[in-house]
UniProtKB/Swiss-Prot annotation:
Family recorded in the similarity comment: Belongs to the RbfA family.
Region (Disordered): 115-134
Keywords: Cytoplasm, Ribosome biogenesis
UniProt GO BP: maturation of SSU-rRNA
HAMAP family assigned to the protein according to its UniProt record, in alphabetical order: RbfA
Oligomeric form and interacting partners: Monomer. Binds 30S ribosomal subunits, but not 50S ribosomal subunits or 70S ribosomes.
Protein name per Swiss-Prot or TrEMBL: Ribosome-binding factor A
Taxonomic classification: Bacteria, Bacillati, Cyanobacteriota, Cyanophyceae, Synechococcales
Organism: Synechococcus sp. (strain CC9902)
PROSITE patterns, alphabetized: RBFA (PS01319)
Name of the coding gene: rbfA
Pfam families in the record: RBFA
InterPro entries per UniProt: KH_dom-like_a/b (IPR015946), RbfA (IPR000238), RbfA_dom_sf (IPR023799), Ribosome-bd_factorA_CS (IPR020053)
Record-level Gene Ontology MF annotations: ribosomal small subunit binding
Physiological role: One of several proteins that assist in the late maturation steps of the functional core of the 30S ribosomal subunit. Associates with free 30S ribosomal subunits (but not with 30S subunits that are part of 70S ribosomes or polysomes). Required for efficient processing of 16S rRNA. May interact with the 5'-terminal helix region of 16S rRNA.
Main location: cytoplasm
Amino acid sequence: MAQGRRVERVAALIRKETSELLINGIRDERVHKGMVSITSVEVAGDLQHCKIFVSIFGEPNDQNEVMEGLEAASGFLRGELGRRLQMRRAPEVKFQLDRGLEKGTSVLGLLNQLEDQRQERGEIPPGSDELQPD
């Protein structure tokens, strides 16, 4: 059980430090082409590998460039994490694009379209919050 808590603690620290490095430490211009948010961090039980899930707000071409920049900076990031977290061996860092926010926005758009169609047909009165959660 202590192993699980340690992994969670390391993941939280990696998320915090990576966020700071995205703002102040990484100089690659590709990384700053879109708004980058770290959505989650998964660390292997042996602390040798970690996956950093990022959400990138911007055009698809910009998203690809940002991902290339992040991958290029992963070696620098690994060294900085090792230094800042005082780990003997910092985990190998991999970035993965998290499309959860895009999917959520898409679902909300579909729900809004459905509500508009139902209002046009007179099934629900305008301004009704029938589709809104309680």
